[in-house]
Regions:
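Acidic, metal-coordinating catalytic segment for phosphate/diphosphate chemistry
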Residues: 24-72
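Short connector loops at helix/strand junctions that flank enzyme active sites
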Residues: 50, 65-69, 81, 93-95, ...
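Beta-strand scaffold of nucleotide-dependent catalytic cores
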Residues: 71, 84-88, 148
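Conserved hydrophobic "DFG−1" position in protein kinase catalytic cores
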Residues: 74-75, 86, 151, 173
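Conserved Nudix-box catalytic region and its N-terminal flanking loop in Nudix hydrolases
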Residues: 76-121
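Unchanged
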Residues: 105-195
Length: 198
């Protein structure tokens, strides 16, 4: 620039440079830390796990209700004995663990439909929702409510071949009780083998 002062902008960080220690850091998201109605942060909670929570800004009370999970108990008549269909998980939680087929109940979904849907999604085995009957309902300490649906027994030869799905490496038959990936699955399977869900 002729006869004028040249002004330079402040230095710009190159990709890979460390941010300045005084630069504002992004906020870490904390689940359930703000009111779902107005967005104000919850303040003056007696503890991080205190529920229900009332927003001091808008007065709305929030509850942390259990997440319902539908789990299938499908008896299979094998050549020597009768067992239950189980899957091997390929996703977290408990990736690599053996479990009963199951998953979260969708919004406005009937629990019997959820049992049949989860069985199909995780094993490829079709079942009619109207054939599902309540075997048990159990709660865990993580805030889940597991609803175990019992289906009529089927011969092993009538099932489709076991193939991997989006969440499992396929299905297998459990012929005796043993520890499963989730304690409540272990409890429900043991109860079935003991004759309490037949």
């Amino acid at each position: 620039m002729r006869g004028g002062t040249v002004r330079y902008s402040p230095p710009v960080s190159e990709p890979g440079d460390s941010p300045s220690p005084t630069a504002p850091q992004p906020l870490r998201y904390e689940r359930n830390s703000h009111c779902g109605t107005c967005g104000a942060p919850y303040t003056a909670l007696p503890s991080a796990d205190a529920w229900p929570r009332t927003c001091t800004h808008c007065g709305t009370t929030a509850y942390r209700n259990p997440l319902p999970v539908a789990v299938a108990l499908l008896p299979v008549i094998g050549p020597r004995s009768t067992g239950l269909v189980v899957i091997t998980r390929t996703i977290e939680p408990q990736k690599g663990g053996t479990a009963l087929p199951g998953g979260f109940i969708d919004h406005a979904e009937d629990w019997r439909h959820a049992v049949a849907r989860e069985l199909r999604e995780e094993t490829g085995i079709e079942a009619a929702a109207q054939d599902v009957r309540l075997a048990d309902a159990l709660s865990d300490t993580d805030g889940h409510l597991l609803v175990f649906g019992l289906l009529p027994a089927r011969p092993l030869a009538s099932l489709p071949p076991s193939t991997p799905t989006d969440e499992t490496s396929g299905y297998d038959i459990l012929y005796s009780p043993r520890p499963l990936a989730f304690p409540l699955h272990t409890e429900a399977a043991a109860a079935w083998f003991a004759g309490r869900h037949r």
